[in-house]
């Protein structure tokens, strides 16, 4: 195993931060390949809790190289706020530990302004954006007017591109969206200061990662969000603006698919999602509220409460197929401890038949009725288990059904938020 991917197999918030931190112990390089600071990871080590948004989880180790690839959109202000936060809690962030792609797109102040104003203009049809400027930044990338990190390293180039973008964006912001114009000089001065601080971290990350893999070093690719938020395979338009599946790794860092050996899908023992969008197994009742409170289901980035529901294996099976998952890591089975009965969705009733795939059309999905299997629950002793054999029998039956239905082995089980509350039962 020289290069492997850690991906969310649901709508994000599956526990990727903890699992990446756990698996990073085996890696020498940890790489982010898509998304931006709209993602949030919580990692607990001992009695300390760390909240990460943009920087890879491997930063908590002193001996790991962390990489922000070209597929990531970088907000310099958010980046240095996160660096300051980490250094304030005793985590060193240096160019020896963190490098950033010169090809990564920069999130600019007008991206955040556009994000907020366009969401407001949608009214009741809003898509639940975090307002971080992620979507507008990716839009500029594909409209070929985006500003990259390498542009910021050349003052004249940056100034010219910024001037043209400010002219165009201000016209749209003021005349179409009714907002206030942004100041060219303020943004220029702010970003030139960022350039000085950013320069030591910048290099061609594709070459760096490629060389590390060729030297047989272990590289971990850390996904953000989840498969059902993928721009192509998610619940469009209630998705993020990047490819969150395994396919995003190759374009998001610049390596070939033959260099990736394994892909681990992270899934909770139940299902959650934030914001609007379809959710077939959602529990809008006391059980859903109970899961939310016991599982502390509130967003790291936004603080928004997460919608909670029964485990939807149709979603996880779809993730396994689309990303070619070689194993699953099932998290938060301790959260379900105490429920007498549990349900798992193994299909949808649709147009008089049962299907086991996720429809592309939201209109079709709205007609789908979950088909459930019921399981007996388990008690809180599950949180004390450190081997598979120590798990309650009912928890084992639940996990076995997950592996059977998705045709994907389970390699890791999470029984609590801390690094040590992790059971390894197989290779990934």
UniProtKB/Swiss-Prot annotation:
Taken from the UniProt entry, a GO cellular component term is:
cytoplasm
According to UniProt, the reaction catalysed is: IMP + L-aspartate + GTP = N(6)-(1,2-dicarboxyethyl)-AMP + GDP + phosphate + 2 H(+)
Enzyme Commission code(s) on record: 6.3.4.4
Q: Where does Mg(2+) bind?
A: 13, 40
Name the active site residues: 13, 41
Q: Which cofactor does it need?
A: Mg(2+)
Q: Does the keyword Transcription regulation apply?
A: no
What SMART domains does the record point to? Answer: Adenylsucc_synt
Membrane-spanning regions, if any? Answer: none
| Pathway membership | Purine metabolism; AMP biosynthesis via de novo pathway; AMP from IMP: step 1/2
One GO molecular function term of this record is: adenylosuccinate synthase activity
Task: Report the top EC class in one word.
Answer: ligase
Provide the binding site for substrate: 300-306
List of residues binding IMP: 13-16, 38-41, 130, 144, 225, 240, 304
Q: Name one GO biological process term.
A: 'de novo' AMP biosynthetic process
- Chief subcellular location equals cytoplasm
Sorted keywords for this record are: Cytoplasm, GTP-binding, Ligase, Magnesium, Metal-binding, Nucleotide-binding, Purine biosynthesis
Q: What Gene3D superfamilies does the entry give?
A: Adenylosuccinate Synthetase, subunit A, domain 1, Adenylosuccinate Synthetase, subunit A, domain 2, Adenylosuccinate Synthetase, subunit A, domain 3
Assembly, in brief, is: Homodimer.
Q: What does this protein do?
A: Plays an important role in the de novo pathway of purine nucleotide biosynthesis. Catalyzes the first committed step in the biosynthesis of AMP from IMP.
Name of the protein described by the UniProt record: Adenylosuccinate synthetase
**Which gene is annotated as encoding this protein in its UniProt record?**
purA
């Amino acid at each position: 195993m020289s290069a492997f991917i850690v991906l969310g197999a649901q709508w994000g918030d599956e526990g990727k931060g903890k699992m990446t931190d756990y698996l990073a112990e085996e890696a020498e390089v940890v790489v982010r390949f898509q998304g931006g600071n709209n993602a949030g990871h919580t990692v607990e080590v001992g009695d300390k809790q760390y909240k990460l948004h943009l920087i890879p989880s491997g930063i908590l180790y002193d001996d790991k190289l962390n990489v922000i690839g070209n597929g990531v959109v970088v907000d310099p202000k958010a980046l240095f706020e996160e660096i300051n936060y980490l250094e304030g809690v005793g985590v060193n962030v240096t160019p020896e530990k963190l490098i950033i792609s010169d090809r990564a797109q920069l999130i600019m102040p007008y991206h955040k302004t556009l994000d907020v104003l366009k969401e407001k203009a949608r009214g009741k049809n809003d898509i639940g954006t975090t307002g971080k400027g992620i979507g507008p930044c990716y839009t500029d990338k594909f409209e070929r007017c985006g500003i990259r990190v390498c542009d910021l390293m050349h003052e004249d180039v940056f100034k010219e591109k910024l001037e043209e973008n400010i002219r165009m964006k201000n016209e749209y912001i003021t005349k179409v969206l009714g907002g206030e114009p942004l100041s060219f000089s303020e943004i220029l001065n702010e970003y030139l200061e960022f350039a000085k601080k950013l320069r030591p971290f910048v290099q061609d990350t594709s070459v760096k990662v490629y060389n590390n893999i060729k030297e047989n070093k272990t590289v971990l690719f850390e996904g953000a969000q989840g498969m059902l938020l993928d721009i192509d395979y998610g619940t469009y338009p209630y998705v993020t603006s990047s490819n969150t599946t395994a396919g995003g790794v190759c374009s998001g860092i610049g390596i070939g698919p033959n260099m990736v050996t394994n892909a681990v899908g992270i899934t909770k023992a139940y299902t959650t999602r934030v914001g609007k969008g379809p959710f077939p197994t959602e529990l809008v009742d006391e059980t859903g509220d109970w899961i939310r409170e016991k599982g502390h289901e509130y967003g790291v980035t936004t603080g928004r409460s997460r919608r909670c529901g029964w485990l939807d294996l149709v979603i996880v099976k779809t993730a396994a197929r689309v990303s070619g998952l070689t194993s699953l890591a099932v998290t938060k089975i301790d959260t379900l401890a105490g429920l007498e009965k549990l349900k798992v969705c193994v299909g949808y009733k649709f147009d008089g038949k049962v299907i086991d795939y996720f429809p592309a059309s939201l209109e079709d999905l709205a007609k789908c009725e979950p088909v459930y299997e019921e399981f007996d629950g388990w008690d809180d002793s599950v949180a004390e288990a450190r081997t598979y054999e120590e798990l309650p029998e009912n928890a084992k039956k639940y996990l076995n059904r997950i592996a059977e239905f998705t045709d994907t082995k389970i390699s890791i089980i999470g029984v609590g938020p801390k690094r040590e509350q992790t059971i390894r039962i197989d290779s990934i």
